[in-house]
């Protein structure tokens, strides 16, 4: 009898973290690798947030807090939703967890029974399907390639709904594509949802503040307040405030769900870090004037990467509205031989080829559920990004047509 549960047998470690691990190993060995695989901002946590954490330490704020998050932080989150999204939540409709990932995990653990279906547009963030599977749910994938602007249409959604559908996942702006749903697209999705009262929606808004070209961000509960009780909104401080390591995420939804998720959290991690919670209060309540400049900086990096990669004969690029990723179509290169005679058969082969020949780390598209693509993160310096993209271009140029 194996000591490892059968439930875990189909679950794999995060492929994006695997890329980072391999890259770090190569760097340690002295190889000049440029990493375009990590999904975190390259700017530092703002000083006022750091000072908020330091003050918490000096004040001895190092004890347990409420399992579901301290009231002061939940009030800051409540105020944020009202101020930025015009959505009203009560404190008992909000939960704070150790990162957005735990919020989502708690949600599915608390709400899914065996056989419940979760509609996941592909490409998707790598953790969605495995968290659904760990919660005994069934992921239902809907391919949304570059021809669909990487977004789920209302028609495709309706075709995917069955009597077993319990959740739909919407991630906007998206990881791995940066694609973002506008008002009309969300309204069309809401029209479908009004026909199917058994379908709930998880709206993952973690990249809310990283949008480009005057794109106007909307979240579903803001557009369809009549569906609010069926919508669970996930957000956090990781991306907008560059606090990935501080591990504070939050979610808002029905009191029934929050109560159930709190039970899950009480038997796993208990409360999020007290010091990080105080830092998050400062993030949400403090100055917000660095958010737009950081987004503009990301936009400049997007434009730089696009200007180079669009020149590559085998690539097709989508211009994302947000986040800090490009999801590049590369299937035209499949079947071609490298200069060493190796055939590139899929996105894994292609990512391996770039790592070995260009010395650039990217993530294969299959990791996000859609073959024929690769993802780069442009959350790095302009100099490193330009160098990496030129390396990719030159490496592909030597492959015979």
Curated annotation (Swiss-Prot):
GO molecular function: glutamate-prephenate aminotransferase activity; L-aspartate:2-oxoglutarate aminotransferase activity; pyridoxal phosphate binding
Residues recorded with modification N6-(pyridoxal phosphate)lysine: 239
InterPro entries in UniProt: Aminotransferase_I/II_large, AspAT/PAT-like, NHTrfase_class1_PyrdxlP-BS, PyrdxlP-dep_Trfase, PyrdxlP-dep_Trfase_major, PyrdxlP-dep_Trfase_small
Predominant cellular place of this UniProt entry's protein: cytoplasm
The organism's place on the tree of life at top rank: Bacteria
Primary enzyme class: transferase
Range of residues in the leader sequence: none
Cofactor(s) listed in the protein's UniProt record: pyridoxal 5'-phosphate
GO annotation, cellular component aspect: cytoplasm
Pfam family, one: Aminotran_1_2
GO biological processes: amino acid metabolic process; biosynthetic process
Binding-site residues, L-aspartate: 39, 125, 175, 375
Catalytic reactions on record: L-aspartate + 2-oxoglutarate = oxaloacetate + L-glutamate; L-arogenate + 2-oxoglutarate = prephenate + L-glutamate
PANTHER family: ASPARTATE AMINOTRANSFERASE (PTHR46383:SF1)
Assembly notes: Homodimer.
Described function: Catalyzes the reversible conversion of aspartate and 2-oxoglutarate to glutamate and oxaloacetate. Can also transaminate prephenate in the presence of glutamate.
The protein's name: Probable aspartate/prephenate aminotransferase
Annotated source species: Rickettsia conorii (strain ATCC VR-613 / Malish 7)
UniProt gene name: aatA
């Amino acid at each position: 009898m194996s000591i490892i549960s059968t439930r875990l047998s189909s679950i794999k470690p995060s492929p994006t973290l695997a890329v980072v691990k391999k890259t770090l190993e190569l760097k340690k060995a002295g190889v000049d690798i440029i990493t375009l695989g990590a999904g975190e901002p390259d700017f530092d946590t703002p000083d006022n947030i750091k000072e908020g954490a330091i003050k918490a330490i000096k004040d001895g704020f190092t004890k347990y807090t409420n399992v579901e998050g301290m009231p002061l932080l939940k009030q800051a989150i409540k105020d944020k939703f009202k101020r930025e999204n015009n959505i009203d939540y009560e404190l008992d409709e909000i939960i704070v967890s150790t990162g957005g990932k735990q919020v989502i995990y708690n949600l599915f653990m608390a709400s899914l029974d065996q056989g419940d279906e979760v509609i996941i547009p592909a490409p998707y963030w790598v953790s969605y399907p495995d968290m659904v599977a760990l919660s005994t749910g069934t992921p239902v994938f809907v391919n949304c390639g570059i021809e669909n602007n990487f977004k789920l249409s209302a028609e495709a959604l309706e075709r995917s709904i069955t009597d077993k559908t319990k959740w739909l996942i919407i991630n906007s702006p998206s990881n791995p594509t940066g694609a973002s749903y506008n008002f009309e697209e969300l309204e069309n999705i809401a029209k479908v949802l009004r026909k199917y009262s058994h379908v709930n929606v998880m709206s993952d808004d973690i990249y809310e503040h990283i949008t480009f070209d005057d794109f106007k961000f909307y979240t579903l509960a803001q557009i369809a307040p009549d569906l609010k009780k069926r919508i669970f909104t996930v957000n956090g401080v990781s991306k907008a405030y560059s606090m990935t390591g501080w591990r504070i995420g939050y979610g808002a939804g029905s009191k029934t769900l929050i109560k159930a998720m709190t039970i899950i959290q009480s038997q796993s991690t208990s409360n999020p870090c007290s010091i990080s919670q105080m830092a998050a209060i400062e993030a949400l309540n403090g100055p917000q004037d660095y958010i737009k400049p950081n987004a503009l900086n990301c936009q400049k990096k997007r434009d730089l990467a696009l200007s180079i990669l669009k020149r590559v004969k085998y690539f097709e690029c989508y211009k994302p509205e947000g986040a800090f990723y490009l999801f590049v179509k590369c299937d035209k290169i499949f079947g071609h031989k490298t200069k060493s005679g190796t055939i590139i058969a899929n996105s894994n082969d292609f990512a391996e080829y770039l790592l070995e020949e260009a010395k650039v780390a990217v993530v294969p598209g299959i990791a996000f559920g859609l073959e024929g693509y690769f993802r780069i993160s442009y959350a790095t310096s302009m100099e490193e990004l330009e160098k990496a993209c030129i390396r990719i271009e030159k490496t592909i140029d030597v492959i015979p047509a």
